[in-house]
C-alpha cells in the first residue's frame, strides 16, 4: 500500500489496484469456477506511467498470473486482463457513457458489445444476441450467440455509475479475457 500512500492521487491509485484484482478474479473464475476472491493475497504490479494505459500483472497464488491493461482518466478506471500474455493486445474493449434516463445499464452494455461485434463480423445487429443462462439455478457468465448458435467468443461486460464497458477477444477458451 506504499504505492497508494505515495501516489499523487491516492483515490485513483487505490481504485486502480481494486480494478486489477477484480479483473484477475473474473479471468481466473472462468478457469477455476470455485476460486475464492482473496484480494489481499493477490499482489499487483504495474507500470503506472503518465499515460492513460498501463500494463501490469496480478499474481493469483496456486492459479497463475493475469496480465492486465489498466486504463484511467479523470472520469473512470477500466481494467482488462488475460491469462496468456500473447492475448493481451488482442482484446477489443470500450467504455461508453450510459444515456440519461431510465436506461438499463446491463442491457445497454450488451447493446454496445453487440454493435461492436456486428461491425467486426459485418453482420446485422439482430443476428447477435448476448444471453445469460442458468446452471443449477445459478446465473452463468454472458455468452454470444450468432444466428441462434452459441459461440466461443470470450466476453466481459460491466457497468458502474454512468459508464458501461465491454471486452471481447476471439481466441480459444484457454486465452480468457475481461
Locations of regions flagged by a protein language model:
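Core catalytic alpha/beta fold that binds nucleotide/phospho-ligands
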Residues: 1-178
Amino acid at each position: 500500500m506504499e504505492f497508494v500512500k505515495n501516489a499523487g492521487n491516492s483515490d485513483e491509485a487505490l481504485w486502480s489496484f481494486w480494478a486489477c484484482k477484480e479483473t484477475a478474479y473474473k479471468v481466473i473464475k472462468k478457469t477455476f469456477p470455485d476460486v475464492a476472491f482473496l484480494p489481499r493475497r493477490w499482489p499487483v504490479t504495474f507500470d503506472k506511467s503518465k499515460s492513460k494505459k498501463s500494463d501490469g500483472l496480478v499474481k493469483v497464488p496456486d492459479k497463475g498470473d493475469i496480465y492486465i491493461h489498466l486504463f484511467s482518466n479523470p472520469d473512470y478506471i477500466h481494467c482488462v486482463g488475460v491469462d496468456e500474455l500473447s492475448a493481451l493486445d488482442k482484446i477489443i474493449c470500450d467504455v461508453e457513457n450510459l444515456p440519461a434516463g431510465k436506461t438499463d445499464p446491463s442491457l445497454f452494455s450488451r447493446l454496445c458489445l453487440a454493435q461492436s461485434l456486428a461491425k467486426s463480423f459485418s453482420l446485422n445487429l439482430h443476428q447477435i444476441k448476448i444471453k445469460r443462462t442458468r446452471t443449477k439455478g445459478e446465473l452463468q457468465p454472458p455468452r454470444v450467440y450468432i444466428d441462434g448458435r452459441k459461440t466461443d467468443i470470450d466476453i466481459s461486460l460491466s457497468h458502474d455509475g454512468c459508464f458501461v464497458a465491454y471486452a471481447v477477444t476471439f481466441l480459444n477458451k484457454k486465452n480468457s479475457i475481461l
